Amino acid sequence: AYLLALEGYRPLIVERGAAVRERKADVAHFWETGVLDPSSNVQFGEGGAGTFSDGKLNTLVKDTAGRNRFVLETFVSFGAPEDILWEQKPHIGTDILIDVVEAMRNRIIQLGGEFHFHSQVTDILPREGCLVINGREKIRTEAVVLAIGHSARDTFQMLYDRGVCMEAKSFAVGVRVEHPQEMIDRNMYG
């Protein structure tokens, strides 16, 4: 959205969750009471799941195009600490990231972008050229970019039901298992 706004487009960001500050309060409420807001929590809301993660910024090790550098420089321009530009494992804490996300949103709005929070895409109507929001409101659009993360199963189901072509993203899961050396030796050497 930020790049589109910089290029003169007026992106409309439709977010099923809350704005980042409201989301922070919703997450704190969950941690204190155990009461979950299904659309504003550690997974859903402005900033995505990474906002409430351990703060590590995953870097593109083989990024010969310099995209990662651009992202880090953009974060710094919106208030992230400069050391993320040279640290081997850059890190931004949640409190700082909330300020960065909010500053980016404000800049996108200054450039003509628009944000709709608590607005879930519940249907896509390609023939009409519109999205359905919260099962009621229709928004006309010429192009749609979905950045829904992996937890929006209801949205994936809607896309599947609509016949949208999708493919699973490959991923790997690592497991570390420790065994006594004697057991390893016995299994290896008899």
Please identify what each model-predicted range represents.
Residues 1-190:
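Residues forming the flavin
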